[in-house]
Each structure stands twice: as structure tokens, then as C-alpha cells.
UniProtKB/Swiss-Prot annotation:
GO biological-process terms attached to the record: methionine biosynthetic process; methylation; siroheme biosynthetic process; sulfate assimilation
The reaction(s) this protein catalyses: uroporphyrinogen III + 2 S-adenosyl-L-methionine = precorrin-2 + 2 S-adenosyl-L-homocysteine + H(+)
Lineage: Eukaryota, Fungi, Dikarya, Ascomycota, Saccharomycotina
Record bears the keyword Hydrolase: no
Name used for this protein in its record: Uroporphyrinogen-III C-methyltransferase
Entry-linked Pfam families: TP_methylase
One term of GO molecular function: uroporphyrin-III C-methyltransferase activity
Organism: Saccharomyces cerevisiae (strain ATCC 204508 / S288c)
Keywords linked to the UniProt accession: Amino-acid biosynthesis, Methionine biosynthesis, Methyltransferase, Porphyrin biosynthesis, S-adenosyl-L-methionine, Transferase
Record family assignment: Belongs to the precorrin methyltransferase family.
Entries under SUPFAM superfamilies matching the protein: Siroheme synthase middle domains-like, Tetrapyrrole methylase
Disulfide bonds: none
Keyword Transferase belongs to the record: yes
Region annotation Disordered: where it falls in the sequence: 278-303
Amino acid sequence: MVRDLVTLPSSLPLITAGFATDQVHLLIGTGSTDSVSVCKNRIHSILNAGGNPIVVNPSSPSHTKQLQLEFGKFAKFEIVEREFRLSDLTTLGRVLVCKVVDRVFVDLPITQSRLCEEIFWQCQKLRIPINTFHKPEFSTFNMIPTWVDPKGSGLQISVTTNGNGYILANRIKRDIISHLPPNISEVVINMGYLKDRIINEDHKALLEEKYYQTDMSLPGFGYGLDEDGWESHKFNKLIREFEMTSREQRLKRTRWLSQIMEYYPMNKLSDIKLEDFETSSSPNKKTKQETVTEGVVPPTDENIENGTKQLQLSEVKKEEGPKKLGKISLVGSGPGSVSMLTIGALQEIKSADIILADKLVPQAILDLIPPKTETFIAKKFPGNAERAQQELLAKGLESLDNGLKVVRLKQGDPYIFGRGGEEFNFFKDHGYIPVVLPGISSSLACTVLAQIPATQRDIADQVLICTGTGRKGALPIIPEFVESRTTVFLMALHRANVLITGLLKHGWDGDVPAAIVERGSCPDQRVTRTLLKWVPEVVEEIGSRPPGVLVVGKAVNALVEKDLINFDESRKFVIDEGFREFEVDVDSLFKLY
């Protein structure tokens, strides 16, 4: 689906979550059939939201009896057995709002269409939201099929087709719910508990303001009351791990929880504890596999440039006598889709005793891991990357010394900005030579997935793969601009402003086409086309959906309809969302061999 901000329909409704506590909702009529189910459902919804449902002009004595039987025990429920009067709109409401009712539901027989119209126009004048059953022309809002978590986690899922089929909307809703993990209630409850605990412990002085103008609504964390309002383009903001300011230190747990929510396997979120953060982020707290001895982590750009002392890892003490040694493989899992996982990688995943996975490995790949296989997800987040890497290496070394088969599962390809070479040397230095299985690198796969021919005659005759983040967060060496080259930048979108400024200063053409490809090969893949000079502005506008790459060059638009890429100041980008080209049944695939 291609989304162009200029041609989006202007009549789509604005979907919000409205608060109804203590509000008065007027239900006029109860339907023209023997069934009163629609009215009952609405009363249930109003009561569950904390509102006061008042039924005026019930359609029949039978309806009145049914409603009294079911809702008469609720103090907030009321039935007014008389004909509706227009004055009810301004006399049955709360004193706080001058007796004006807060919301109106109309379900009258077709013979009273004239009255429906009168009620609608009066509600319009009084700015009262109104819904008239099966009459969109007399409605200012619609009720949406909604699933409410019966375990009380607070999770609600609503779907609307905007008049294109209520039954279809319900089916889509059921399909979404069926794909949720069985422990979704526990996941939501646990994440809410951790969020509240962090707020209480780290932000006591600001708590009275209840999120507003507090650090919890800072860009990139997404903990405010408005769930669509967080600035996700700053979600992976560069944090120099060993040079954090006091402010960054104070927000460390907040940042950790944000990353856990975004990247960690959904069904594992119910088991996350704050103690996991304390263990992974504190240099003074050692895990079971971590003590101070001579085994050290290989030097990296980050700890060399920051001039910090390397944290040391232990070799687990070996028992005397012959002992079975473990095996390790560094496995590339590709960009995200199961269809782009190699047979060799799949075999390693299925035969591992323990899997050490990057946080960016998508859920679809993690779901292939057998339930009994121990899985350890790297606890990396901005400001904790180095310590998390050392923890992961220590875990791998301990498992190897215990004779286990270890699979180090990496996103993309291990040797394309994946620290695979460093990890190879680390395990080799400790007596274990890894088997390395290549994976399809996102740097090349994402061009195909975005309909970008990285090379094409008369358009692009070379490809360059670069990082957008050099040592200590500095810009990498800026390559020269070559008109016939397709350049792919990894780890660049979180600092697009700095990178693009550097490119333009070094002579790059600001009008060259650019594409932001995010979550390539995943169902929520997003491809955004624009011009190089507008990339920072576009990233800020659309937010972040990591992981992502930036592709620059004329090849970006080689296969795209020209009318989609006629950009100007009023139309700076176009978005193409979704990826459903391939579906692979892994179990059936294994039966073939």
C-alpha cells in the first residue's frame, strides 16, 4: 500500500480513546425489533467505562423488563419510561456541565426518522457527540468492534472498516487477537508495573505533574498518555556508554525499558524484572558466568575511543580430566523474513542447546527456536551496548565450557557491521573456533525488497555499503559522491541529521533520490522515498521503525512510477507499507529433507 500524504482521503474519522468516567450517556429508544442486544451492548460498554447510561423512551415494555432485569442492580443505570423530549439533552446531564448530556445514542424505529433528524441537529448545535443506529448521516461518531482483555490488563483492540463491513471488521479483530501470545495479559500488566515503578523511583519530584512536562514524556520513550505522540525518530539516539551525563544516567532505566518493549520477544516480556537491568548494566554486579580473570573482551571501537578500561570476563573453571567441549556457530538470520533464512541457519537453530540472539532478530525468526532450547537475548540499549556484549560473550563461553552447542544468532550477516569478526577472535582465543554461516545482509536484501535495483545498466554500476556511525559516535569517513553508485548506509537513521549534513558538506547532491527502508521483509516493512536533502526532516515526520537502512542513488526510483516521485516543498516523501510476498511453512519444509 502506497501512502501519499497529499492524496490521503480527507474524510477518514479521527480515532481516539475517550474517557467516560461519571459522564451521562443518553440512549434514546431501544430498537425496533424484539431483540434489545444492541442497547445492552452499549450499556455494558458505558458502565465498563465508568459512565452513567440513561435510557429514554424504551421501544416496548418487553425491552424495559429485560433491561431492568440485567442492569437494575447498577446505581448508575436509569430508565425513563416516557417519550423523548429535546429538552432532555439539556436537563438530564451533570451539574458540572450545566445539565447538558455528554453523549447520545439513538435507536428509534424507521417511522421516527424525522425525530432522529431533529435530535441530530440539536446535538450538533450543542456540540454533543451523537450516534444514530444505521444512519451515518445523522451520526458524528461510530462505535467500533472492540476486544477488551478479560483479565483486566487494560489492553483494548478496536478495528473499523469505516462502513465497509461490520462483519469484516469483527473478523479482522478476531484474526489480530488470535495472533497475540497466550500470555498477553501478563505481558501488558508486567510492562505497566515496571513503567510505574520506574516513574515512582526515578521521577518522584515530577510525579505530581502526571507525565506532563516530565522526563517520561521526553522524546524517544513513549510513556505519556498519548500513545501516538512520542517522537520515535529519537528512540535510538546515540548514547556514549562511558561518557553519559548525569541526566542520561538518571534516564538509563527508562531507556532500557523502552528498548525491551520494542525489541524483546513479546511472549518473554511477562518475565522481565528490573533486576535484569541491574545485572546487565552495573559493572559491579556479576552474573553467574562473570568474574574477573584474565579473559578479556576483544577491543572495540567504542571502548578504545572512550579510553575506558575494558571489563574482563572469566573463563569458567574447567574440571580436571577429559571433558566434552562445546561447539559454537555464528549464524546470520537474514533481514527478518523466515523465507530469507538459509537452510543451514535453520538447521543450526533447530539443533542448538542454547541460542544467543541479537535484540534485532525479529519475532518470526525467534519463533522457530524449539521451546526447550535456552534462549538469551542481548540486553543492548543505547548506553549499555558494551556491557551487554560482554555479558553475552561470557554466557557463550560458560555454555561452551559446559559442553553445549552454542548458536550466536545475528541479524543480517555476521560480518557486515555485525561484530562477527570480533566474536570469532574472542572464542578462538579461548579455544573454540566458530563455524560461520553467512546470512542475507539487509544492506543488499532491502534494496530488492524496496524495488530498488542496486545495479542497473545506465543507472548504477557500483554499490557501496557504509556505516552511518563511526568511532565514538563520530561521522565515518565520508565517501566521495559518485552519480552512478548506489550507497547503502546502515546504523544511520538515528542520526540522520548529522550524517546528511556531513554528506552535503562533502559535495553530495542534495537532490539525489533516497529511500528509508525499515524492517525489511517483515509484515510491517516500510519504504519511504524522498530526496537526500529532506531525509532528516522526513525521519522526524514519520518516526522510527528500527532496524532500517538508508539507500541513496538514482537506482532508488528506477522502477517507480514517475508520478509518485514528483517531490516538491509541499510533497516531500511517499510511503509504501507492508510486505507479504513470501510465506514459508517451516515444518513442511523440513519434511522435504
